[in-house]
Curated annotation (Swiss-Prot):
Localization per Swiss-Prot or TrEMBL: Mitochondrion inner membrane
Keywords: Electron transport, Heme, Iron, Membrane, Metal-binding, Mitochondrion, Mitochondrion inner membrane, Respiratory chain, Transmembrane, Transmembrane helix, Transport, Ubiquinone
Binding site for heme b b562: 83, 182
Protein name: Cytochrome b
Gene name of the encoded protein: MT-CYB
Domain of life: Eukaryota
Species the sequence originates in: Akodon subfuscus (Puno grass mouse)
Length: 379
């Protein structure tokens, strides 16, 4: 068996990726979230596949087909809520994974980092089109508001929006194509994840100390397979608690009402994992400016490798940048809170301050703190 896994063309790839992979001996539990994201993707694809067997992408029957899944299909309620809450778990793991990458300087591995940003954007797109499918009030109005943002693009905006809608409003054509996108995108995410791993294994993982670990590597199996299994069991425990005890806690009550184009909800807001970007969008009074800020709020992650001037790897020995990093995390939480609040004083003002702070920390404060720390090292 040992000879087979090292020589067989297919098993050799698996062996080099998950068994004999040389891994730093000191990586902490923060490195577990990559495998947890893989687990979340598997859960989402499997539950989504079973949901797709019973779902109908037609405006007249979409809402009732979701109700039918929950009421009449064997364990349909469980599959539906595993899928809905699985998306939340996916984004929790994703945010922690990106946060760990920023803290420990993983953005230095630029190819892996940039593929990760593409994965992040693709996952957000998948979640957005998926949120439209139950065809509740918030699904419909969320789709209308977010797709309508493209009309801010000069010259081609209106045509582009009508092209995406497949008509002059969000209707049957929109729902059908969103279902098609939602079905295919997870498989594209899986393909990108393999490319992400490919680039990671070219350079090897970094580690919490930020020091070169070439002289201190251990095989991935059994040490980290056991560690990842513990993480997977804990993830499943949290997901099952969420699904079985609090299935609707992260959903929107408006989505229990079928979509009605003639009745606008009091506060249109996306799912919780988009609220930080939604708050940035709303904080700019100009429509085109808001859309650009929304896109930049994610794409600015690509600036980390370019703005990095530090002579050290990661933040473990950099107290000044550590403080700025935790202010950045707190600021993100404030943006998430503001995104779910109505557009009125004082929330608009807090949102504008938090949005400016978000970009200022990445573009100004972190590079300045890097320079300060480099000068301290010279002393």
């Amino acid at each position: 068996m040992k000879i087979l896994r090292k020589n067989h063309p297919l098993l050799k790839i698996i062996n080099h990726s998950f068994i004999d992979l040389p891994t730093p001996s000191n990586i902490s539990s923060w490195w577990n979230f990559g495998s947890l994201l893989g687990m979340c993707l598997v859960i989402q694809i499997l539950t989504g596949l079973f949901l797709a067997m019973h779902y109908t992408s037609d405006t007249t029957t979409a809402f009732s087909s979701v109700a039918h899944i929950c009421r009449d299909v064997n364990y349909g309620w469980l599959i539906r809520y595993l899928h809905a809450n699985g998306a939340s778990m996916f984004f929790i793991c994703l945010f922690i994974h990106v946060g760990r990458g920023i803290y420990y300087g993983s953005y230095v591995l630029s190819e892996t980092w940039n593929i990760g940003i593409i994965l992040f954007l693709t996952t957000m797109a998948t979640a957005f089109v998926g949120y439209v499918l139950p065809w509740g009030q918030m699904s419909f109005w969320g789709a209308t508001v977010i797709t309508n943002l493209l009309s801010a693009i000069p010259y081609i905006g209106t045509t582009l929006v009508e092209w995406i809608w497949g008509g002059f409003s969000v209707d049957k054509a929109t729902l059908t194509r969103f279902f098609a996108f939602h079905f295919i995108l997870p498989f594209i995410i899986a393909a990108f994840a393999l490319v992400h791993l490919l680039f990671l294994h070219e350079t090897g993982s970094n580690n919490p100390s930020g020091l070169n670990s070439d002289s201190d590597k251990i095989p991935f199996h059994p040490y980290y397979t056991i560690k990842d299994l513990l993480g997977i069991f804990l993830l499943l425990l949290v997901l099952m608690i969420l699904t079985l005890f609090f299935p609707d806690i992260l959903g929107d009550p408006d989505n229990f009402t079928p979509a009605n184009p003639l009745n606008t909800p009091a506060h249109i807001k996306p799912e919780w994992y988009f609220l930080f970007a939604y708050a940035i969008l709303r904080s700019i009074p100009n429509k085109l400016g808001g859309v650009l800020a929304l896109i930049l709020s994610i794409l600015i992650l690509a600036a980390f490798p370019l703005l990095n001037t530090s002579k050290q790897y990661g933040l473990i020995f950099r107290p000044v940048t550590q403080v700025i990093y935790w202010i950045f995390i707190a600021n993100l939480l404030v943006l998430t809170w503001i995104g779910g609040q109505p557009v009125e004083y004082p929330f608009t003002m807090i949102g504008q301050i938090a949005s400016i702070t978000y970009f200022a920390i990445i573009i100004i404060l972190i590079p300045v703190s890097n320079t300060i720390e480099n000068n301290i090292i010279k002393l």
